[in-house]
Amino acid sequence: MIDLSRRAMLAGLTGTAVLATLSGPALALTEDQAVSYVQSMAADIEKTINSGRSDAQMYKAFEQLLNQYADMDTIARFALGPAARSASSGELSAYTAAFRTYLSKKYGARFREFIGGDIQVQGARKDKRAVIVSARAKPRGQSAVAVDFHVSDRNGKVFNVILEGVNLLTTERTEITSLLDQQGGSISNLTAELKRRS
């Protein structure tokens, strides 16, 4: 069983792939296309990890990877839960910006622990609305763990990651809605708290 600190570190590697919008026409994504996409993402993550950048530069680079490989607007709305439906456009915009930075710092902080590690794609299979790409993530000096990337058949982006049975998408929603409750249901207060934690 993977320990919590190791799970958090591995989550940092796969945090670019949590959720992308499921609206719009289907792309009829092939397994080969999904594999190629995940391989490209993994290569960019490894390149960033091994770049020798400072922590601040790593966080910024990770935020760019999130923007490139995931629909961050949709991720933020999903994580916020039902409260997103009643939020004003201004509240949602401010929250989304804060959430994006918060997420990049949260997972980016674990990057250095993976220097010298890698992600190896094992194969892919079709699912209802996605192609599931199976991989093995191996931190330096530790055993490899199973990671499943769910790539949307509608927009070609990764919309969820299952890391040793842990659903990263629902994990983020649980954490953000809990923070929202702690802030009395105020989205503006939640936004301020996310900024404080970033």
Where are these regions (language model features)?
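Early exported N-terminus immediately downstream of N-terminal targeting peptides
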Residues: 31-107
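Surface-exposed, polar/charged faces of alpha-helical domains
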Residues: 47, 53-57, 86-90, 113-116, ...
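Low-complexity, intrinsically disordered terminal/linker segments enriched in charged
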Residues: 163-198
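Surface-exposed, charged secondary-structure patches
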Residues: 105-145, 193-198
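Sec/Tat signal peptide C-region and signal peptidase I cleavage site
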Residues: 24-28
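Hydrophobic h-region of N-terminal signal peptides that target proteins for export
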Residues: 17-23
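Short beta-strand edge/turn micro-motifs at domain boundaries
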Residues: 144-170
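N-terminal secretory signal peptides and thylakoid transit peptides that target proteins
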Residues: 1-16
